């Protein structure tokens, strides 16, 4: 399978415990995970933040006053996908622990999820759209060698 091209900027905010998140997100793996979810070439920035920055961004842009796992800011979908993906490290870490997943596996899923959002996929418009997006995410994760992220 031919994968699309990706120009990636990978950024880590400064926060306690950031090194564990750097270790879970080697650049080559992040590139691989995102490229598997792309249907077009892309320029994507991935930023790993603390709870304070994650909450501030979610409050400002989604009017929800809490830190969420991933925020997608899509700027263009054609001819090149241009987006920022912001992942909140404490939320991702907590969810991985609660779901009995390795940290890198949960990051892989959220990067796939965010990359699909950057290309116009939406799970909040209808149950049918949510099912379709989840099925596609599951297929991508299995291509990458991971288990179904939605399995109980």
Curated annotation (Swiss-Prot):
One of its GO terms (cellular component) is cytoplasm. GO terms for biological process: rRNA processing. It is an enzyme of class 3 (hydrolase). Belongs to the endoribonuclease YbeY family. InterPro entries: MetalPrtase_cat_dom_sf_prd (IPR023091), YbeY (IPR002036), YbeY_CS (IPR020549). Its EC number is 3.1.-.-. The keyword Protease does not apply. Transmembrane segments: none annotated. NCBIfam families: rRNA maturation RNase YbeY (TIGR00043). One of its GO terms (molecular function) is RNA endonuclease activity. It is found in: Cytoplasm. The gene is ybeY. Keywords: Cytoplasm, Endonuclease, Hydrolase, Metal-binding, Nuclease, Ribosome biogenesis, rRNA processing, Zinc. This is Endoribonuclease YbeY. Single strand-specific metallo-endoribonuclease involved in late-stage 70S ribosome quality control and in maturation of the 3' terminus of the 16S rRNA. Its cofactor is Zn(2+). Binds 1 zinc ion. It comes from Paracidovorax citrulli (strain AAC00-1). Zn(2+) binds at residues 113, 117, 123. It comes from the Bacteria. Pfam families: YbeY. Disulfide bonds: none annotated. The keyword Zinc applies. HAMAP family: Endoribonucl_YbeY (MF_00009).
């Amino acid at each position: 399978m031919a994968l699309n091209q990706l120009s990636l900027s990978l950024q880590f905010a400064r926060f306690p415990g950031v090194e564990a998140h750097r270790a879970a997100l080697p650049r080559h793996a992040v590139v691989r995970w995102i490229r598997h979810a792309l249907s077009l070439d892309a320029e994507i920035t991935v930023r790993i933040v603390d709870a304070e920055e994650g909450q501030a961004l979610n409050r400002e842009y989604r009017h929800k006053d809490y830190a969420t796992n991933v925020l997608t800011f899509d700027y263009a979908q054609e001819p090149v996908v241009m987006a920022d993906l912001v992942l909140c490290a404490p939320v991702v870490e907590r969810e991985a622990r609660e779901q009995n997943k390795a940290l890198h596996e949960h990051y892989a899923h959220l990067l796939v999820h965010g990359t699909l959002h950057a290309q116009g996929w939406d799970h909040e418009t209808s149950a049918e759209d949510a099912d379709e997006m989840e099925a596609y995410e599951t297929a991508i994760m299995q291509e990458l060698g991971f288990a179904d992220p939605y399995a109980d």
